[in-house]
Amino acid sequence: MDNCVIGLETANHQLGIHPKLNKVVRQNVNEELTPIVPLKFSTITNRYNQLLLKFKGGYSVEFRAFDDGFAYRFLTDLKGEQEIMNEILRLNFVDDCLLHLQQPDGFKTSYEEEYRHQTSSEWKNSNRMALLPLLASTPKGDKILMSETNLTAYPIVTGKHKNHLYIKK
């Protein structure tokens, strides 16, 4: 991936526009968690490398690389309640990827559409949105599944350029 963008828009702030890095904090975590209601396993291994980037403007972005996944989240020191208007993630794949995605005709959907399979360059020309989760298969055989957690508004994905995915809430 190349020239990717991550940002967060609140009612009063745009975080991630011309970021100024203040501090970098790295941490390795390797712990065993005991689930409240154990189903199959009595412990869960929680192992990841964490990178916390603290920026000028009262916000940070935390990245976690697990053995089998990757996650990020925004943290803010902004005063009072903050209404999140939009979260932006622009991914620019260097090579054309095969995408596996649902493309409904509108926002009213029961998530029953069949998954379509098309390259990122074909999708760019279709000018259609897609829903998460979305699976991208790279020419090298890597698979990248993009999803979302803790939803109150459902994100959409659009293809703006040849190998560019724009995820917007």
Regions found by a protein language model. Name each.
Residues 1-169:
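N-terminal accessory beta-strand-rich subdomains and adjacent acidic, glycine-rich linkers
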